[in-house]
Swiss-Prot record:
This is Putative phagocytic receptor 1b. Involved in adhesion and phagocytosis of hydrophilic particles. The keyword Disulfide bond does not apply. GO terms for molecular function: transmembrane signaling receptor activity.
Amino acid sequence: MRLQILLIYLICIIVSSIVLVESSNKHHFKENDEVPFYVNNVGPYSNPTETYEFYTLPFCKPSSISYKKTKLGEILQGDSAVLSDYQFPFKSSFENKQLCEYTLKKEDIEKFKKAIGEYYYAEMIYDDLPIFSFVGTVDDSDLTNIRYYLYNHIPFEFDYNGDQVIRVNIDTEHIKVIELSDQDEITLKLTYSAKWQPTEHEFSKRMDLYEEFFTKELEIHWLSVMNSFFLVVLLTAFLAIMIMKILKNDYSRYSKTDEEEDSDYQEDYGWKLVHGDVFRFPPYKNVFSAFYGIGWQFISIVCGILALSLFGMFYPNNGGNMYTAGIVLYALTSGISGYQSAKMYKNMGGNKWAWNIVLTATLFVAPLFIVVILSNTVAITWHSTVALPILTMIEVITIWLFVGFPLTVVGGIAGRRLSENFEAPCRTKNFPREVPPIQWYRRLPCQILIAGFLPFSAIYIELFYIFNSVWGHSTYTLYGILCLVFLILINVTVCITVALTYFQLSMEDHKWWWNSFINGGSTVVFIYMYSIYYYYYISHMYGLLQATFYFTYMLIVCFFFFILLGTVGFYSSLIFVKRIYRNLKSD
């Protein structure tokens, strides 16, 4: 375990160097220096995934289209920034500068009306700072005469400190509009202005300004998290005391039974009765081992992502650093999955080593690949910028083929050779004991409801903020809270899974291996149900493109956390079961 923690630490250092934020030395300017101004994407405000290139709308284009050089993470998040004709020399203020003047045809007017009616939202970039603005506004107070207004003058405000840009904003109070009437042609004149003003904010903290904007409900947020934290502490204490008290009584009863004379001998009962079967390995050893190994890899990835977030790697408009970090972490931690999977597989007496490695390497990647192909096909049909270019897909596949898969093989070989034999406190009998009939409310489906609901209830408030960030326009920057919530989730999962495993053994049901894994991961059932509720009743998302991305990628996210939490549930149950049977004197 210490080796794994050290490995995660080293990997985080490597990832930090790969996705490191550009040095502030590249953001120094002299007065009147030209700073490139990029226009990125446009799309419906309600559908954050449905984005299109800026010039799919009939704005006046530059004489030649020059795309901004993009990193892997920027491509994955659908960025398609183009150098525009806007010119903002450093520290140079001006009024009503003309961008262009041209004629809108009938079809161009209809395109703008459609975009304004769907609340199209545009993103622009200046010195790596994001600028957001609607395309126009609509007056629908009279439904019989809806009027559309296009922004034709945008006033920009710039804050600077010395020779560096600190913030860029749009003065919404002084935006000018032009009505898009039903004429066949409209002459459109686009203008803009710039106002530069000094500030005391430091460049190194310029992203804090965006964090302040996006965290107005910080106090409510912290209050809800602390409420969940204290509830979890009480739940953990209650379950721990209850289990310890029950186990103490069990040990006392079993000790009395062992001390009785042969004439008064009583047959074992409860969880002691299944001591000869409790360490009998489950069916589908290869699949179970693969899940287990991948689960440890995912735990490492989440810990790495959280560590990088606390180091300030993921700030607003960070060029897709989180996507890049996720891919690099997945590739570099593949050895962990191979090692843990092979180690468990050897303990179970498996001998199909090649199949074990292949299954470990593809059990998550294969469903992910199917989802990417499906969603990418829809995005290409819609001509959206979220459609991944073929070269990008080849690049990601190459990373997996030449880094991820080989590390899985190396980890598998190491796990096979370095792992020790499985040490069970009790000897397993030759023939499995028949499981007695169990009441319906004690069976696995009911266990799933209990095991999934309690961890979900501890995190559902945080899910709202996470969903607003991932599937909305909010920016999540409270990574300290996220770490705390993750620890709460792990803690509740451990407590509930261990308790359910004990009750299952008490009913003389020794088939706890798969049950503990499924119970641990059952929280994702409620997470996916919440995602359905969020889509239809909280968000305003619509359309096939957005729905395809939303529901398919939520399936993958839930599958990810099913494996992660399932591994946590099983591993904690394994430690618990070993402990109680080690303390029991068995015949």
